[in-house]
Amino acid sequence: MAFNDDNFMLKNEAAKRLYQQIKDQPIFDYHCHLDPKEIFEDKVYDNIVDLWLGGDHYKWRLMRANGISEEEITGSASKLDKFKAFARTLQRSYGNPVYHWSVMELKNVFGVCELLTEDNAEEIYHRINAYLVEHQISPRKLIADSRVRFIGTTDHPLDDLAWHKRLTADDTFETVVAPTFRPDEAFIEHQRFADFVARLAQATGRTITDFKSFIAAMEERIAYFAENGCKASDISFTEIVFEAAEPEQLDRLMTRVLEGYQPQPLEIKQWQTAVFAELCRLYKHYGFVTQVHFGALRNNHSAIFNKLGADVGVDSLGDQAALAINMNRLLDHLVQRDSLPKMIWYNLNPSYNITVPNTLANFQANENGIAGYLQFGAGWWFADTKLGMISQMNALAEQGLLANFVGMLTDSRSFLSYQRHDYFRRILSTYLGEWIEEGEVPEDYQVLGSMAKDIAYNNAIQYFS
């Protein structure tokens, strides 16, 4: 069987027919970690390592697993040596999604059809570097060539959004680049919480002395983001919790933490519950889609974290007790307060793939006619794999309505990651095609094709409008 040809990942004739209907659709990438400054400056790349390996902790993680020295991963080794080290790793990475992503990127972006190995790495390295310069490969060119219509970046609440403003004012660039409000530091367990409160007070000109004044200052920043095109928020929680507290308790807790007190687990849960509930109230008011990523255990290798910082490939999926109880109580609390915004829930641990959409189904009711008001998000991070995508879609189809799914996102720091949308579309086509081939749904390519188009692109546009 041919590898990485036009029918790559398309396992049956029905899949091939469905894929033809969605392969050329534009991309609505509603969540990523691209830098708007890089998009605006649009510098031409001259080295594949900067574009392909720099900051890519997926690749770094594999290279460590292959015995590559840190010098050749994040250290001072030459770029050629780093490229060769990755080539040695890639040729041993069959079964890992990085292999599929990489061969798709090499072929579809740079025209490299042969497989990258240790033996041809140096020749391909120089060939791609020449291609980068000759074809003036830059962030905007990669975005345009991938037909990306919308990019949702991930942004600190105190960001002045200057680069977003410049991109909005630039008539030569058609893609919308919108900020996303990501308030990780608003939670008391964060090591920079006290500094964040001080900076928040300075940015808003407010005196923050208690929970109420803290939320008022947060609303001012949310309003600022809304004025500058923000359509979504995001947050990452280790666990989903629900622990109610009285306002006076929250005031005392905030005062103590700002004085240097280390909060206890119960207090962390109380603060997370209260702050997130207030933020959801504001997100609903300002029309933000609320994205919740949960289940990551971060920075587990302390030596690497202390040397390199966060997001360097030493994170894991986590587990937790009483997810269903906490999630149901939290969502019900939001409903009771009329504070339930449109939400996308991304679960990192696939063992909870039934729990999440099953719980969301309890709270889908809304009077605005919004289909899929609460979304079970695409397979995230370690679940961003063929099996992870299928598991997520299976769970959603069984517990809700797959046809209303808002589809794929890159959640990436790389301008080459738009190939993941094509990867997803191929897997989606095979998934739906198998239903046809096995006689589980009518062989109606108009209905199934429309469903595939909606999942690949149309649903996201409508959901974020």
UniProtKB/Swiss-Prot annotation:
Pathway: Carbohydrate metabolism; pentose and glucuronate interconversion
Keywords for this protein: Isomerase
EC number: 5.3.1.12
Pfam families noted in UniProt: UxaC
One record GO biological process: D-glucuronate catabolic process
S-S bonds: none
Keyword Isomerase (UniProt): yes
Lineage: superkingdom: Bacteria
Catalytic activity: D-glucuronate = D-fructuronate; aldehydo-D-galacturonate = keto-D-tagaturonate
Record-level Gene Ontology MF annotations: glucuronate isomerase activity
Gene3D superfamilies documented for this protein: Metal-dependent hydrolases (3.20.20.140), uronate isomerase, domain 2, chain A (1.10.2020.10)
Record's keyword annotation contains Isomerase: yes
Matches recorded under HAMAP family: UxaC
Family per similarity comment: Belongs to the metallo-dependent hydrolases superfamily. Uronate isomerase family.
Protein name: Uronate isomerase
The species this protein was found in: Streptococcus equi subsp. zooepidemicus (strain MGCS10565)
